């Protein structure tokens, strides 16, 4: 399973706290405000609990768990290019 976390947090200190926590869990930055990595529903729950402690009004954090094959079918648009994750052999490990 792959845990994906997308966030919009206005304060740099709070963003940094969440980023450091996500890295400790083994998630990697895949976009400016998106982290992904191997995990389980329990990992997602841990992220959600930590996010509740960090976010304030106006902030948002989105946490989802998908199967790896679903993640590999993700479509990516990066402003210059478009690709499907599996075509780039892109991994979050």
Curated annotation (Swiss-Prot):
Q: According to the UniProt entry, what is the EC number of this protein?
A: 3.1.-.-
Tell me the keywords, alphabetical order. Answer: Antiviral defense, Endonuclease, Hydrolase, Magnesium, Metal-binding, Nuclease
Pfam families per record: CRISPR_Cas2
Q: Which range is the signal sequence, renumbered to this chain?
A: none
Binding annotation for Mg(2+) = 8
The family database entries (InterPro entries) matched by this protein are listed as: CRISPR_associated_Cas2 (IPR021127), Virulence_VapD/CRISPR_Cas2 (IPR019199)
Name what cofactor the protein needs. Mg(2+)
Q: One GO molecular function term?
A: metal ion binding
Q: Coiled-coil regions in this chain?
A: none
GO annotation, biological process: defense response to virus; maintenance of CRISPR repeat elements
Task performed by this protein? CRISPR (clustered regularly interspaced short palindromic repeat), is an adaptive immune system that provides protection against mobile genetic elements (viruses, transposable elements and conjugative plasmids). CRISPR clusters contain sequences complementary to antecedent mobile elements and target invading nucleic acids. CRISPR clusters are transcribed and processed into CRISPR RNA (crRNA). Functions as a ssRNA-specific endoribonuclease. Involved in the integration of spacer DNA into the CRISPR cassette.
Protein family: Belongs to the CRISPR-associated endoribonuclease Cas2 protein family.
Subunit details: Homodimer, forms a heterotetramer with a Cas1 homodimer.
What's the protein here called? CRISPR-associated endoribonuclease Cas2
Species the sequence originates in: Thermofilum pendens (strain DSM 2475 / Hrk 5)
